Amino acid sequence: MTLLIQNARCWNGGGFHTADVLLQGGKIKSLGTSISSDGVNALFDARGQYFLIPGFVDVHVHLREPGFSYKETIATGSGAAAAAGYTTVCAMPNLTPAPDTPAHLAEEQAIIDRDAKIQVLPFASITKGRKGSGELVDFEALSPKVVGFSDDGCGVQDEGLMREAMVRCKALNKVISAHCEVNDLLNGGYIHDGAYCKANGHRGISSASEWKMIERDCRLASDTGCRYHVCHISTKESVEVIREAKKSGVPVTCETGPHYLVLCDEDLQEDGRFKMNPPLRSRSDREALLEGVADGTVDVIATDHAPHSAAEKEKGLSGSAMGIVGLETAFPVLYTKLVRTGVMTFEKLIQMMAVRPREIFDLPVGEIVPGAPADLCLLDTDCNWTVDPDKFVTMGRATPFAGWQVQGKNRLTVWRGEVVYEALR
């Protein structure tokens, strides 16, 4: 397959230049001006207006297969990712069975091989059954087949267990991607323990339940040298703990989600589409996260895309399942609320969604140069549209951004040199 993208504003690592880009055999063959279209299978005109960048990478998604295909499938979840401009997603292990043995992992991989629209890289669990306690998995057997290890949805409660996991992952040069939550500090909470919670009679999740585990794990990462990535940070204390750990040379990286950067508990409504874990925190937490983005403490923006059935999300804040969908809203919401308002540069957003995730998880560098993988997306930053969950590709519909007017849309996604999504014509 040979593709030609004409008149694109191409990412060059720190900015953009206008060029034609020829793709052949799954690679970028050449860049230039007025490249001939002779022999090309498909031609796309970016009009000198659209931005061609390395495909987005989401290091935190829940694709729900095997075990929960009534919520999402690998086909629908990866299709949603393709529509949003992602060419790689990393799938969390809260599945049935959990990918805690090579045989269980093979079940998930077989579905990926059959149905994935883009690259789907699985995480294996840290503990057997992804329980956050008990017995560790066979890291050595699983390591060649996974992007990293995570018990996402559960924090590893025992310090000795986490230390051993880090020692073994360090020997394998694998990342531990940690959901940080101290069970003893949850107290049955389901939204942030803030003003809205108290005023409306809800049960709150303390900030300490998150940052205290991060503090413990940063100490363990310092001791062991393990590459330690913190999932979905949401509190100002977490930002500060990670900032200080980085200053001390701890090999720690972290992500936050779009919703934590543009919403806080002042935006809560009595609706399950506002319920996720971690919860929306306070305004001061959101401001601290934005400061962490600005100074590099926060490395990556990941969606924590977590679809549920409609029935599971229609029980208000107290009764609904935790989790929202995020793939198809991430770029437009962030571009509208942060880039358009001057909080963040467009280049910084690309770094956090397309470049830095590749660096942390040892993926091929996202470059638009001859010989690089043809994993690309084409962004229209002028398109204005209304978020309508009924038009999503994902099976999930629960988003706090329903009805928002946003600017920015993906027009084309190419993975391994093949068009996997197009909305140009």
Model-derived regions: residue spans:
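N-terminal metal-binding scaffold of metallo-dependent hydrolase/deaminase domains
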Residues: M1-G39, Y50
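C-terminal cap of metal-dependent C-N hydrolases
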Residues: A8, G316-G319, P373-R425
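Divalent metal-coordination and catalytic microenvironments
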Residues: A8, G26, Q49, H60, ...
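His/Asp/Glu-enriched, well-ordered alpha-helical/loop segment
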Residues: A199-R227, A294-D295, D299-I301, A306-T381
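Metal-associated gating/positioning segment near the N- to mid-region
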Residues: Y50-D115
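Histidine/acidic residue-rich metal-binding segments in metalloenzymes
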Residues: G134-I301
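Active-site mouth loops of central-metabolism enzymes
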Residues: V59-E72, L121-S133, G153, H202-S207
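Alpha-helix-loop-beta-strand connector modules within alpha/beta enzyme cores
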Residues: P102-Q119, R168-A178, T329
